[in-house]
Amino acid sequence: MTMIKICGLSTPETIEAAVQAGATHVGLVHFAKSPRHVELEKAAELRALVPESVKAVLLLVNEQPEETARAIQIVKPDVVQFHGSETPQWTKAVRDQLGIEVWKALGVREAATLEKSRRYEGAVDRLLFDSPAKKLPGGNGVTFQWDVLAGFEHHTAWGLAGGLTPDNVGDAIRQTGAELVDASSGVESAPGVKDIAKIEAFCEAARNA
C-alpha cells in the first residue's frame, strides 16, 4: 500500500485529521520563509500529538549543523527531510551522527535530474521527487512530468511530491508506482491553511489508487 504524507501541518486539529484519515507520515515545516513555518517549540508540541503508528517528519532547508542538531533535539522527529541544496556528504553525516532517518527532496526537471539523484545512494533513507523549486522549495502546487520516472531504476526508497491533490493523486500513483505520496498545498484552502475535507479526500484517493 502506498504511504501517505501530509506536509505543512500547523494545528492540533489538522494533525488529528491527517492521522484519522490514514496518513502514515505528517510533516512539520521549520523554514521561516514558508507560509507553513512553525517555530521549534510549537513543532515539538505538535509532534507530541502524533501517535507511534504515524511518523513525524521535520522539514528543514539549508540549516547550519548546530541548528539542525538543535531542531532535531527539540522536536524529536522520526524523520528529518532536507529540502534545500544539502549535499550527499551533509545528509550522510546527519544520518550517521544523529542516528535519524533522513530524506532528501529533489526538484525534477528531466530524466537527467533523476540520474543526478544517484549521488545520494547510501547517503539518505528516502528521496522525494518534487517539482523544481520556484521562490520557495516545495509547497508550490505545481506538478512535474511524471513520465520522466518511467523506466528509472530506483536504488533508494522514494516518494512523489509536487502539486498532488485529491483529484490527481490516484493517477500519479498509477503512472509512477510511487511508494509514498506527499501533499501540502494540494490539501489547503489558502497558503498555509490546511483543509480537513481535502486531507480526508486525498488520503482516500491515495488508498483507493
From Swiss-Prot:
Functional pathway: Amino-acid biosynthesis; L-tryptophan biosynthesis; L-tryptophan from chorismate: step 3/5
Q: What class of enzyme is it?
A: isomerase
Q: Return one Gene Ontology term, BP aspect.
A: L-tryptophan biosynthetic process
For this UniProt record, the keywords arranged alphabetically read as follows: Amino-acid biosynthesis, Aromatic amino acid biosynthesis, Isomerase, Tryptophan biosynthesis
From the UniProt record, list the reaction(s) this protein catalyses.
N-(5-phospho-beta-D-ribosyl)anthranilate = 1-(2-carboxyphenylamino)-1-deoxy-D-ribulose 5-phosphate
- Catalytic activity, EC: 5.3.1.24
Q: Which Pfam families match?
A: PRAI
Molecular function GO labels = phosphoribosylanthranilate isomerase activity
Note the InterPro entries from the entry.
Aldolase_TIM, PRAI_dom, RibuloseP-bd_barrel, TrpF_fam
Q: Which family does it belong to?
A: Belongs to the TrpF family.
HAMAP family in the cross-refs: PRAI
Spell out the protein name for this chain: N-(5'-phosphoribosyl)anthranilate isomerase
Q: Which organism is it from?
A: Erythrobacter litoralis (strain HTCC2594)
Gene that produces this protein: trpF
